Swiss-Prot record:
It holds the Pfam family Ribosomal_S9. One of its GO terms (biological process) is translation. This is Small ribosomal subunit protein uS9. Signal peptide: none annotated. Belongs to the universal ribosomal protein uS9 family. One of its GO terms (molecular function) is RNA binding. InterPro entries: Ribosomal_Su5_D2-typ_SF (IPR020568), Ribosomal_uS9 (IPR000754), Ribosomal_uS9_bac/plastid (IPR023035), Ribosomal_uS9_CS (IPR020574), Ribsml_uS5_D2-typ_fold_subgr (IPR014721).
Length: 134
């Protein structure tokens, strides 16, 4: 039996985690077990779709792989960022020569910004209750 070639990348953004698998194919998207025509059916927003697919578009590999994505946590914006990092890391497994191009465009950097925790005595993370002088 022929061995299935697969490239795996994990991406995280805010509280979202995406596990991305690329298999040589005709460009299908399978997100959380559902086959979709394109990523817009899942993300619903053109800007998020462009954001998520930037590594594949930049490296001209968009139609060459079937993309299997398991994504959980967070909202759609965070999930788009997680998918983007996952695709970039999987493409790096496919071809190490893409590293300078991906790195130059900031696609291999994990965005470390997460929500700051709420502190006691404050209304939000930094918002203090209104101060009254008298």
């Amino acid at each position: 039996m022929a061995e299935i070639v697969e490239y795996i990348g994990t991406g995280r953004r805010k509280t979202s985690v995406a596990r991305v698998r690329l298999r040589p194919g005709e460009g299908k998207f399978i997100v959380n077990g559902k086959e979709l025509k394109d990523l817009k059916e899942y993300l619903h927003n053109d800007a998020w779709v462009r954001h998520a697919l930037k590594p594949a578009v930049l490296t001209d590999t968009l139609g060459r792989f079937d993309i299997f994505i398991r994504v959980s946590g967070g909202g759609l914006s965070g999930q788009a960022g997680a998918i983007r990092l996952g695709i970039a890391r999987a493409l790096l497994q496919f071809n190490e020569d893409l590293k300078p191009l991906l790195k130059q465009n900031g696609l291999l950097t994990r965005d470390a910004r997460i929500v700051e925790r709420k502190k006691y005595g404050l209304k939000k993370a930094r918002r203090a209750p209104q101060f009254s002088k008298r």
